[in-house]
Structures are given as C-alpha cells and as structure tokens.
C-alpha cells in the first residue's frame, strides 16, 4: 500500500514537472521567465506536503535535505565552477561554421567530454560553435546534435565524463574499466556525425542560396585562445571530482563504523568532508578564474548569469520532485524482472531520460549486484557481468540525451543557445528529434552489443 501511494505520488510529480517545463515556456514565456521560482516551489510542495502527511514531517525534512545536501549542492557547484571557468576562455580565429568544420568540432568536443566531463566540454565548446555559426540562419540542428554528442554520449569513457560512472568508480569499478565502451562510442559517433553532416550540408546550402555568407577574416590564425590559463582551473575542477570519488574510500575520512565523516545537518543527513573539499576546490577555481582573466574576455563571450540561474532554479525542483520515483525504484528494483543486458540498457536509459541518471545507475547496479553472478566485474555491491555493466553504463550516459532534463548540460546548452538567438526546439520538439535520430542508433547499439 505504501509503495502504491508513493508510486502514484511520483507519477503525478513527474507528470506535473514535465508539463510545466514543456508547456509554460511556450504558452506564457514572459510569465515563465518571471515566475520560475514560484513554479519550483509549487513542485516541491506537491511532493513535500503529501510526503510529510504520510511519513511525518521529520522524515520529509530529512528526505529533502538529503537530496539538497547529498546530491544537489555538489551538482550545482560543479556546474557553476565549469560555467565560470569556461566563460573565461574564448576560442576565436578564421574558422567559420560549415559542415566539415562543424563535424570536426563536434568530434573533438565529444572526446573532450570524457577528459573534462560532459558539463565542462559543453561549456567550453558551446560558445565557439555558436559564434562560428552566427552568420547562418538554419542552425538549430547543430545545437541539438551538440547536446546528443558533447553533452551526453561523449562522457562514457571515464568516471570524470559523467557522474554515473563516477558513482560506479566509488563502488569498486576500476577507473579505466569504462574504456571498454570505446567501440560503442565510436559506432555512435560515426552514425550520428554522418547523419549530422547530411543535415548540416542541406542547411548550409539553403543559407548560401539565400545569400548568407560568413565574414572572411584576413590575417587571422585558424584558432586563437584567449584566457588559455583557465585550462589549469578546469584541471583543478577535474581533480576535485576525482577526489570526491577517492576520498570516501580512505580510512582517514571514515569513522569507526566505516561511515564517511562530515558535519551533521539533520538526523542522518551529513555534509561530508570529501564533499566540502570538492566544493572548496571548485569555488576556488571559479574565483581564481575571474580574478586572473580580463573582463573583456567575458564581454566578447557575451557572458551572462542567465543560463546558470535558470538551471539552478529548475533543477532544485527536479531533484526534490524525483525523490518518490527514486524511492520506488530502490524498494522495487530487484523485483522488476530485469535480468538481461538489453533490458538493463533500456530500463536504465528510459529512467535516466527523465530522472537524475546517477541514482538511476546506482539502483540498477545494485540490482545487478544482488543477482549473485559468479563472474564479471567485482564491485562493492556484488559481481556484475561485463556486458550487463556496459549496458547499465551506456543506458545511463547515452539516454540522458533523450530530453532536455536528462542531463544538466542539455538545459545549459539550450539556455545559452536561446540567449544567442537560436530558436531551439520545444521540450516535446526536442524529444521528437531524439526519437528520429537517437533511438534508431540505440537500437543498433542493443543489437550489436547487448543482446
């Protein structure tokens, strides 16, 4: 009965959230811009009040604080740090947006995602790609495929690339294990970049036919980087992320019971010392970036706080309202009857499209670890077969690209694109792009790698 009540509540929260995100910016864009915070408060109350009535106020407060302190705080600080540092790096030169250059930029950005994270790569490459294609009219497809590849799929090779893999690393999966996903990544890149090239070639020819021409910059180098020293601060942030997965395993950061030490907040909620260290390093990197970079670089980048503010407000509501669904998953995950790699791939991916992919990954990794396999990858949760772990990893990382809310960089890229006059698809419009181009690729992934 409790599970039924929780399930009904979670479905209502998810439905209301998605409808609000999808419809309100289209029907009342001015209202949405002014009242995002009110909408978030409403979503949160729709979860908190029934939850408090059913489980008690202390449990409701603990659940919300656990979500905000344990998940949201480090999440938004990481986004903030990368947003600040990347905003102080400007790539410029004589490169102009055409199909070949765009394919190369997307390919490079995709590989960068595994080196500095999908968020870091997105924030680093989004502005140059927008600027290179500023002369073009037909360009929304460029940013959609940017989200597909750079903001999501490219993060599959290392725990730095995407938080679910970092969660796997903290549960005993070796740091370089995810390099096994390289063939899957290459196949996806080939398929999606081929599709993109043909789409971009048609759009490019339309722009040329209409008389649009890029500005030719004479005596300009092919690529010039302003604020290149900020790459050091990106390295600082990457180190902070790695430490967040390494430090909790060390005995120096554990008490006698083996729990990670930290500052008690409320009941079982604790702000851990490794999280504090991660936050401090990231904020220091952001501060140093602003202190050591001339303001003119940010001006040339058209740097504003609008995108990060929108994401911060939006995702605090998402993190809170997804809690009932995650609770149902944790309690019923082992009874879902999902036992094969291809089932794990689609189940993890479908939920990662609308919920935070990190806890979703953990739920299915825990489920797989509890199946008493005798061969595979040894984790702290149990033995998980290689193919099943590949399926869970790919589902969580790849299918965050299915919606704007599947992964934080998605909405950041959308917001920055909107700020720069690119008419991005609506919430459901973007899902239609995913259905046309991503799902067929994922079906091919399933047939080749997970059956």
Question: Residue spans of the language-model regions?
Answer:
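Single conserved hydrophobic/aromatic residue that forms the stacking wall/gate
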Residues: 1-9, 14
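Interfacial loop-to-helix junctions that mark the boundaries of transmembrane helices
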Residues: 10, 31-40, 61-73, 175-184, ...
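Intrinsically disordered, low-complexity non-transmembrane regions of multi-pass membrane transporters
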Residues: 10-11, 45-46, 199-234, 252-266, ...
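Hydrophobic mid-bilayer segments of alpha-helices in multi-pass membrane transport proteins
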Residues: 11, 15-21, 35-52, 72-84, ...
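Transmembrane alpha-helix boundary signature
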Residues: 29-30, 48-71, 80-97, 111-124, ...
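Membrane-interfacial helix-loop connectors
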Residues: 50-52, 113, 124-138, 142-144, ...
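Juxtamembrane and boundary regions of transmembrane helices in multi-pass small-molecule transporters
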Residues: 138, 157-158, 176-225, 398-451
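Transmembrane helical segments that form the transport core of multi-pass membrane transport proteins
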Residues: 236-363, 367-370
């Amino acid at each position: 009965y409790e599970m039924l009540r929780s399930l009904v509540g979670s479905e209502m929260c998810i439905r209301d959230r998605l409808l609000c995100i999808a419809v309100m910016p289209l029907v009342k864009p001015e209202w949405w811009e002014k009242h995002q915070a009110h909408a978030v408060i409403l979503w949160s109350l729709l979860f908190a009040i029934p939850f408090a009535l059913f489980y008690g106020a202390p449990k409701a407060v603990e659940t919300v604080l656990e979500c905000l302190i344990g998940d949201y705080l480090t999440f938004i600080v990481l986004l903030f740090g990368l947003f600040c540092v990347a905003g102080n790096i400007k790539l410029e030169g004589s490169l102009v947006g055409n199909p070949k250059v765009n394919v190369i930029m997307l390919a490079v950005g995709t590989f960068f995602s595994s080196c500095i994270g999908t968020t870091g790569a997105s924030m680093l490459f989004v502005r140059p790609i927008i600027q290179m294609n500023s002369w073009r009219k037909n360009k929304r497809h460029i940013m959609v495929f940017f989200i597909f590849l750079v903001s999501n799929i490219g993060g599959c090779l290392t725990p730095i690339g995407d938080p679910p893999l970092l969660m796997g690393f903290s549960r005993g999966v070796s740091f370089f294990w995810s390099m096994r996903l390289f063939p899957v990544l290459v196949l996806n890149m080939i398929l999606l970049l081929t599709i993109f090239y043909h789409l971009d070639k048609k759009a490019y020819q339309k722009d040329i036919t209409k008389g649009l021409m890029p500005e030719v910059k004479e005596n300009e180098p092919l690529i010039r980087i302003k604020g290149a020293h900020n790459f050091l601060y990106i390295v600082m942030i990457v180190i902070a992320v790695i430490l967040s997965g390494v430090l909790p395993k060390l005995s120096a950061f554990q008490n006698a019971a083996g729990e990670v030490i930290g500052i008690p907040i409320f009941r079982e909620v604790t702000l851990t010392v490794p999280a504090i260290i991660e936050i401090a390093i990231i904020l220091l990197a952001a501060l140093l970036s602003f202190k050591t970079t001339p303001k003119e670089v940010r001006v040339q980048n058209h740097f504003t706080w609008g995108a990060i503010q929108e994401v911060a407000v939006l995702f605090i509501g998402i993190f809170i309202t997804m809690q009932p669904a995650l609770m149902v998953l944790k309690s019923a995950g082992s009874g879902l009857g999902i036992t094969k790699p291809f089932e794990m791939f689609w189940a993890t991916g479908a939920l990662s499209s609308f919920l935070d992919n990190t806890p979703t990954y953990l739920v299915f990794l825990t489920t797989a670890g509890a199946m008493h396999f005798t061969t595979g990858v040894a984790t702290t949760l149990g033995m998980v077969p290689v193919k099943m772990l590949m399926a869970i990893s790919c589902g969580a990382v790849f299918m965050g690209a299915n919606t704007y809310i599947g992964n934080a960089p998605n909405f950041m890229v959308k917001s920055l694109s909107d700020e720069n006059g690119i008419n991005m698809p609506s919430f459901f419009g973007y899902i239609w792009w995913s259905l046309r181009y991503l799902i067929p690729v994922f079906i091919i992934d399933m047939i080749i790698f997970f059956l």
